[in-house]
From Swiss-Prot:
Protein's name in the database: Phosphoribosylformylglycinamidine synthase subunit PurQ
NCBIfam families registered for this protein in UniProt: FGAM_synth_I (TIGR01737), PRK03619.1 (NF002957)
EC number(s) stated in the UniProt entry for this protein: 6.3.5.3, 3.5.1.2
GO biological process: 'de novo' IMP biosynthetic process
Reactions catalysed according to its record: N(2)-formyl-N(1)-(5-phospho-beta-D-ribosyl)glycinamide + L-glutamine + ATP + H2O = 2-formamido-N(1)-(5-O-phospho-beta-D-ribosyl)acetamidine + L-glutamate + ADP + phosphate + H(+); L-glutamine + H2O = L-glutamate + NH4(+)
UniProt organism field: Corynebacterium ammoniagenes
Keywords tagged on the record: ATP-binding, Cytoplasm, Glutamine amidotransferase, Hydrolase, Ligase, Nucleotide-binding, Purine biosynthesis
Subcellular location field: Cytoplasm
Gene3D superfamilies per the UniProt record, alphabetical: 3.40.50.880
InterPro entries, per database record: Class_I_gatase-like (IPR029062), PRibForGlyAmidine_synth_PurQ (IPR010075)
Domain spans labelled Glutamine amidotransferase type-1: 4-225
Residues at the catalytic site: 87, 195, 197
Alphabetical list of Pfam families matching this protein: GATase_5 (PF13507)
Length: 225
């Protein structure tokens, strides 16, 4: 069986093609999903990619979270479908209530476009089993609203229950506790601000470290079949 991973396109999405390529290089079939779709076309997992969906009006991800396709994603994700939000996709997952916290303007109010080392904190999620805890992965980041914020009790919960997945080693955006990515209680839903789909080939990225997220998802899918 070949795993099918859907990649959503909203108006303003930028990185859907890159995410689809990452899915294919990892060994799965990439399935295009449009923001107005309600049928997820039989996919086994979903990637919500980066960009500036709906121009980031209201708040980043706020309008996209209400799109028809996201209503279907929310239903399936709550049933255990592996779901990954990257950058704007992470913002969308928080707005949709699938992940806790919020992403706000970077410290210093600047847009940052950098390659960054992330520490893998939790390698037991559907998207991180190809890594070891403590691994450092080198991936691009590009965002203006990536500063992870949450109430103190939420931070305590995320830390105490192992829901922090990635930490910045350079924390250029001011995220609380250096948090770059988190998961939900089941480990099936993951969001991160940096871009693993831009680190899959040495020709175009700073490393191939990002491919591990997509291979991990394929393994999670096949393990449940």
């Amino acid at each position: 069986m070949t795993a099918k991973i859907g990649v959503i396109t909203f108006p303003g999405t930028l990185d859907d093609v890159d995410a689809q390529r990452a899915v294919r290089l990892a060994g799965a079939e990439a399935v295009s999903l449009w923001h107005a779709d309600t049928d997820l076309k039989g996919v086994d997992a979903v990637v919500v990619p980066g960009g500036f969906s709906y121009g980031d009006y209201l708040r980043s991800g706020a309008i996209s979270a209400l799109a028809p396709v996201m209503q279907s994603v929310v239903d399936r994700a709550r049933q255990g479908m592996p779901t990954l939000g990257i950058c704007n996709g992470f913002q969308i997952l928080t707005e949709a209530g699938l992940l806790e916290g919020a992403l706000t303007r970077n410290k210093g109010l600047h847009f940052h476009c950098v390659d960054t080392h992330l520490e893998v904190v939790n390698n037991n999620t559907a998207w991180t089993t190809e890594f070891e805890a403590g691994d450092k992965i080198f991936v691009p980041a590009k965002h203006g609203e990536g500063r992870f914020q949450a109430a103190p009790e939420t931070i305590d919960k995320l830390e105490g229950e192992g829901q922090v997945v990635f930490r910045y080693t350079d924390n250029f955006n001011g995220s609380l506790n250096d948090i770059a990515g988190i998961t939900n209680e089941t480990g099936r839903i993951v969001g991160l601000m940096p871009h693993p789909e831009h680190a899959i080939e040495t020709l175009t990225g700073p490393s191939t470290d990002g491919l591990g997220l997509f291979v991990s998802a394929i393994n999670a899918i096949t393990a449940t079949v």
